């Protein structure tokens, strides 16, 4: 039996939303194994002096929980 867990994260990038999403997944993958998908819940932009300076996303990342024997699934 497979069990999937979700982790909510926020990430931002001056390059754009796609880069912010990639940064969220990259950061999560540094401590999680078995990442299955990323769901972008919200998009937000930081504005300073009438210009967009940061692109921010709130995401839910799904990953498989390992079984007690140490493997996935």
Regions found by a protein language model. Name each.
Residues 2-36:
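Short, well-ordered alpha-helical segments
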Residues 4, 35-38, 52-58:
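Short connector loops at helix/strand junctions that flank enzyme active sites
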Residues 11-13, 42, 59, 63-65:
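Flexible glycine-/small-residue-rich
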Residues 19-21, 47-52:
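Noncatalytic linker/hinge segments flanking ATPase motor cores
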Residues 38-47:
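Short, conserved loop-to-beta-strand elements that form functional interface hotspots
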Residues 50-73:
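C-terminal structural segments of small proteins and small subunits
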């Amino acid at each position: 039996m497979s069990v999937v867990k979700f982790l909510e994260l926020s990430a931002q990038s001056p390059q754009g939303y796609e880069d912010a999403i990639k940064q969220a997944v990259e950061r999560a993958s540094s401590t999680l194994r078995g990442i299955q998908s990323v769901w972008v819940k919200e998009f937000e932009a930081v504005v300073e002096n009438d210009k967009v300076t940061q692109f921010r996303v709130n995401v839910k990342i799904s990953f498989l929980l390992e079984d007690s024997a140490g493997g996935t699934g």
